[in-house]
Amino acid sequence: MAKHYFQVDVPTWSAAQPERQGRHIFTGSADDGRQAVRLARRVCEATLAARAAGEPLPRRSPDGWGARGVRPGWELDWTAATVVPWRHNSLL
Protein backbone atom coordinates (compact mmCIF):
# COMPACT_ATOMS: atom_id res chain seq x y z
CA MET A 1 0.00 0.00 0.00
CA ALA A 2 1.32 3.46 -0.87
CA LYS A 3 2.04 5.82 1.99
CA HIS A 4 -0.04 8.97 2.28
CA TYR A 5 0.53 12.13 4.29
CA PHE A 6 -1.88 12.59 7.21
CA GLN A 7 -2.78 15.25 9.74
CA VAL A 8 -3.59 14.01 13.26
CA ASP A 9 -5.41 16.57 15.45
CA VAL A 10 -5.31 15.82 19.18
CA PRO A 11 -7.31 17.81 21.76
CA THR A 12 -5.05 19.12 24.52
CA TRP A 13 -5.42 21.09 27.73
CA SER A 14 -3.20 22.51 30.44
CA ALA A 15 -2.99 20.29 33.53
CA ALA A 16 -2.45 23.41 35.67
CA GLN A 17 -5.27 25.41 34.05
CA PRO A 18 -7.79 22.99 32.49
CA GLU A 19 -9.78 25.88 31.02
CA ARG A 20 -6.82 26.47 28.67
CA GLN A 21 -7.51 24.11 25.79
CA GLY A 22 -6.36 23.63 22.25
CA ARG A 23 -5.28 21.10 19.65
CA HIS A 24 -1.88 19.75 18.81
CA ILE A 25 -1.41 18.94 15.13
CA PHE A 26 0.94 16.20 13.96
CA THR A 27 1.71 15.47 10.30
CA GLY A 28 3.56 12.66 8.59
CA SER A 29 3.27 9.74 6.22
CA ALA A 30 1.54 6.46 7.01
CA ASP A 31 -0.26 3.62 5.28
CA ASP A 32 -3.60 4.56 6.84
CA GLY A 33 -5.23 6.70 9.52
CA ARG A 34 -4.82 4.15 12.30
CA GLN A 35 -1.09 3.93 11.66
CA ALA A 36 -0.91 7.74 11.50
CA VAL A 37 -2.31 8.05 15.04
CA ARG A 38 0.06 5.34 16.27
CA LEU A 39 3.10 7.08 14.74
CA ALA A 40 2.06 10.51 16.03
CA ARG A 41 1.63 9.13 19.53
CA ARG A 42 4.97 7.35 19.38
CA VAL A 43 6.90 10.50 18.45
CA CYS A 44 4.99 12.49 21.06
CA GLU A 45 5.86 10.00 23.82
CA ALA A 46 9.51 9.88 22.70
CA THR A 47 9.72 13.67 22.84
CA LEU A 48 8.14 13.86 26.30
CA ALA A 49 10.45 11.10 27.59
CA ALA A 50 13.55 12.85 26.20
CA ARG A 51 12.46 16.16 27.73
CA ALA A 52 11.84 14.51 31.14
CA ALA A 53 15.28 12.85 31.01
CA GLY A 54 17.00 16.11 30.04
CA GLU A 55 18.09 14.64 26.72
CA PRO A 56 18.02 16.36 23.31
CA LEU A 57 14.60 16.24 21.67
CA PRO A 58 14.25 13.82 18.75
CA ARG A 59 14.35 15.41 15.32
CA ARG A 60 11.65 14.93 12.70
CA SER A 61 11.77 11.39 11.31
CA PRO A 62 12.35 10.75 7.59
CA ASP A 63 8.63 10.00 7.18
CA GLY A 64 7.76 13.46 8.50
CA TRP A 65 6.65 12.73 12.07
CA GLY A 66 7.97 14.95 14.83
CA ALA A 67 6.75 16.42 18.11
CA ARG A 68 9.24 19.06 19.15
CA GLY A 69 6.46 21.57 19.88
CA VAL A 70 4.64 19.41 22.44
CA ARG A 71 4.24 21.39 25.65
CA PRO A 72 5.18 19.86 28.99
CA GLY A 73 2.30 20.01 31.47
CA TRP A 74 -0.34 19.69 28.77
CA GLU A 75 -2.48 16.57 28.49
CA LEU A 76 -3.37 15.05 25.12
CA ASP A 77 -6.62 13.15 24.58
CA TRP A 78 -5.55 10.48 22.10
CA THR A 79 -8.97 8.80 22.26
CA ALA A 80 -10.48 11.95 20.69
CA ALA A 81 -7.80 12.31 17.99
CA THR A 82 -9.04 12.85 14.45
CA VAL A 83 -7.21 12.01 11.24
CA VAL A 84 -7.57 13.58 7.80
CA PRO A 85 -5.45 13.50 4.66
CA TRP A 86 -3.02 16.41 4.91
CA ARG A 87 -3.52 19.19 2.39
CA HIS A 88 -0.56 21.49 1.93
CA ASN A 89 -1.48 25.15 1.77
CA SER A 90 1.30 26.93 -0.09
CA LEU A 91 -0.01 30.27 1.19
CA LEU A 92 1.09 29.50 4.76
List each language-model region with its residue ranges:
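Short, mixed-charge low-complexity intrinsically disordered segments
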Residues: 46-92
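A short, exposed loop/beta-hairpin motif centered on an aromatic-Gly-Thr core
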Residues: 20-33
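Short aromatic-glycine-(Arg/Gly/Cys) micro-motifs in beta-strand/loop hairpins
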Residues: 1-23
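A short, charged, amphipathic alpha-helix used as a generic interaction element across diverse proteins
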Residues: 31-54
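Residue-level marker of intrinsically disordered, low-complexity segments enriched
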Residues: 6-8, 23, 35, 41, ...
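A structural signal for the main folded, soluble domain(s) of proteins
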Residues: 10, 18, 27, 76-84
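Acidic-enriched, low-complexity/disordered segments with a strong bias for Aspartate over Glutamate
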Residues: 9, 31-32, 63, 77
